[in-house]
Amino acid sequence: VMNLWPGIRLRVTEGWDEDGHHSEESLHYEGRAVDITTEDRDRNKYAMLARLAVEAGF
């Protein structure tokens, strides 16, 4: 992310869910999922952000 978008940081919007905001099978209830975005909330970056996460092993 730092190399692709200098000065843009990641935002973690949720990691653990105990309020039932996700689907019944969601890994958020086990603490094995995370919702992230970029600090500028630019939706045009989301596809690449997902690709970077997969390449990093997430």
Curated annotation (Swiss-Prot):
<dbReference type="GO" id="GO:0010468">
    <property type="term" value="P:regulation of gene expression"/>
</dbReference>
<keyword id="KW-0645">Protease</keyword>
<dbReference type="GO" id="GO:0008233">
    <property type="term" value="F:peptidase activity"/>
</dbReference>
<dbReference type="GO" id="GO:0007224">
    <property type="term" value="P:smoothened signaling pathway"/>
</dbReference>
<dbReference type="GO" id="GO:0005615">
    <property type="term" value="C:extracellular space"/>
</dbReference>
<dbReference type="GO" id="GO:0005509">
    <property type="term" value="F:calcium ion binding"/>
</dbReference>
<keyword id="KW-0964">Secreted</keyword>
<dbReference type="GO" id="GO:0001708">
    <property type="term" value="P:cell fate specification"/>
</dbReference>
<feature type="binding site">
    <location>
        <position position="19"/>
    </location>
    <ligand>
        <name>Ca(2+) 2</name>
    </ligand>
</feature>
<dbReference type="Pfam" id="PF01085">
    <property type="entry name" value="HH_signal"/>
</dbReference>
<feature type="binding site">
    <location>
        <position position="14"/>
    </location>
    <ligand>
        <name>Ca(2+) 2</name>
    </ligand>
</feature>
<keyword id="KW-0068">Autocatalytic cleavage</keyword>
<dbReference type="GO" id="GO:0005886">
    <property type="term" value="C:plasma membrane"/>
</dbReference>
<keyword id="KW-0106">Calcium</keyword>
<dbReference type="InterPro" id="IPR000320">
    <property type="entry name" value="Hedgehog_signalling_dom"/>
</dbReference>
<comment type="function">
    <text>Intercellular signal essential for a variety of patterning events during development.</text>
</comment>
<keyword id="KW-0479">Metal-binding</keyword>
<dbReference type="GO" id="GO:0007267">
    <property type="term" value="P:cell-cell signaling"/>
</dbReference>
<dbReference type="InterPro" id="IPR009045">
    <property type="entry name" value="Hedgehog_sig/DD-Pept_Zn-bd_sf"/>
</dbReference>
<keyword id="KW-0449">Lipoprotein</keyword>
<feature type="binding site">
    <location>
        <position position="35"/>
    </location>
    <ligand>
        <name>Zn(2+)</name>
    </ligand>
</feature>
<feature type="binding site">
    <location>
        <position position="13"/>
    </location>
    <ligand>
        <name>Ca(2+) 1</name>
    </ligand>
</feature>
<feature type="binding site">
    <location>
        <position position="17"/>
    </location>
    <ligand>
        <name>Ca(2+) 2</name>
    </ligand>
</feature>
<keyword id="KW-0472">Membrane</keyword>
<dbReference type="InterPro" id="IPR001657">
    <property type="entry name" value="Hedgehog"/>
</dbReference>
<dbReference type="GO" id="GO:0006508">
    <property type="term" value="P:proteolysis"/>
</dbReference>
<feature type="binding site">
    <location>
        <position position="14"/>
    </location>
    <ligand>
        <name>Ca(2+) 1</name>
    </ligand>
</feature>
<comment type="similarity">
    <text>Belongs to the hedgehog family.</text>
</comment>
<dbReference type="InterPro" id="IPR050387">
    <property type="entry name" value="Hedgehog_Signaling"/>
</dbReference>
<protein>
    <recommendedName>
        <fullName>Indian hedgehog protein</fullName>
    </recommendedName>
</protein>
<keyword id="KW-1003">Cell membrane</keyword>
<keyword id="KW-0564">Palmitate</keyword>
<dbReference type="GO" id="GO:0005113">
    <property type="term" value="F:patched binding"/>
</dbReference>
<keyword id="KW-0217">Developmental protein</keyword>
<keyword id="KW-0378">Hydrolase</keyword>
<feature type="binding site">
    <location>
        <position position="28"/>
    </location>
    <ligand>
        <name>Zn(2+)</name>
    </ligand>
</feature>
<keyword id="KW-0862">Zinc</keyword>
